[in-house]
Amino acid sequence: MAKLLLVTGLALLLNAQLGSAYNLICYFTNWAQYRPGLGSFKPDDINPCLCTHLIYAFAGMQNNEITTIEWNDVTLYKAFNDLKNRNSKLKTLLAIGGWNFGTAPFTTMVSTSQNRQTFITSVIKFLRQYGFDGLDLDWEYPGSRGSPPQDKHLFTVLVKEMREAFEQEAIESNRPRLMVTAAVAGGISNIQAGYEIPELSKYLDFIHVMTYDLHGSWEGYTGENSPLYKYPTETGSNAYLNVDYVMNYWKNNGAPAEKLIVGFPEYGHTFILRNPSDNGIGAPTSGDGPAGPYTRQAGFWAYYEICTFLRSGATEVWDASQEVPYAYKANEWLGYDNIKSFSVKAQWLKQNNFGGAMIWAIDLDDFTGSFCDQGKFPLTSTLNKALGISTEGCTAPDVPSEPVTTPPGSGSGGGSSGGSSGGSGFCADKADGLYPVADDRNAFWQCINGITYQQHCQAGLVFDTSCNCCNWP
């Protein structure tokens, strides 16, 4: 018994020294910079103390070699990897692929040993050149969407060869080994067509399971984006469309629980109801809900856009069977996640001994704290606390952007922030939040810690005080 207590004590001590047993892996998207006004997000807006790993999405591929995609990726890479100067424990990875990237470049690249070698060599050079700690393979999906059946095995071959090359390079360079991870499917048919789970799991450091987009307007009826459990009336393959089933499918088919990372969406899916009075789960729909003013994509709202909808008079419902909320207003219906559902899922994750949480994406959280009245990064912070991620020795940013110098009534046009502190003093005695600008309906004041920032709505929109949001006039 004394031995057992000693071993337990050592384990607890070791865990205290190493930090949390769980990982919090946060994606950043390089197109978030193009969102208007308060939605614009760059690496400098990331709080480096929240996540254990940050993943930059996405890189591309040309002639079987990894490449940049955006005109300013190299500049953003530096800002992204400089976050490690403020958190010495932070690891950064670069993701390649994504849904819009398709499958063809991956299929060509894995098809021959020479092509794979070309790719792996380019990846090592690229990651070391720009200061990343690993590569995240986001092939959606091997063996599906035009990818031939043999790609299931060739994906395993690629990952095995990459892991071996990374190990060899670490020895030769006397540097820590580069990590190799993958974002993988949550749909059972895509999993079966795409992954040799036991073999693949040997070589991947983490397996990021995309346990979201499980329902959407493509089905013709309402459904939750990322339900923890099935809805009671779901049968057949529909009963597989939940986080619990998907994660256990990966585990039961040969992936170690500690390598499996549960996907958490910081966004929701919107629908148009055919009949506004039929507004529960499974209600008939006629298509995507309207695009949000910042993310500008039909059927999709960032968490901060969701808060605007909720504050505009939507009815919120907690779906106890699936442990997630939904909301509706007139003919608009929303399936989403909130602080409560993130907390419930985090406890479930720990009870099942999974390796941690992955979020898509940190730029979709209420990163300014202006929309939800829950502080900055409320969803990501919920997971950080629930998983016991240590922030010791980490320096968080003070404010998300520079204060504005324009005094009220000067009618400044253009961007969403700029200049230095001083100027208006509008926020000196105001609570944190958003306020209208007296003579400019397109503009609004953002108050943070008594400091004044002037922001602008997207062209054509006006600041609406009924929802504290940018809206159509």
Swiss-Prot record:
Optimum pH is below 2.5. It catalyses: Random endo-hydrolysis of N-acetyl-beta-D-glucosaminide (1->4)-beta-linkages in chitin and chitodextrins. Residues 410-421 have a biased composition (Gly residues). GO terms for molecular function: chitin binding; chitinase activity; endochitinase activity. The keyword Cytoplasm applies. Chitin binds at E70, W71, G97, G98, W99, N100, Y141, M210, T211, Y212, D213, W360. Interacts with EGFR. This is Acidic mammalian chitinase. It comes from Mus musculus. The gene is Chia.
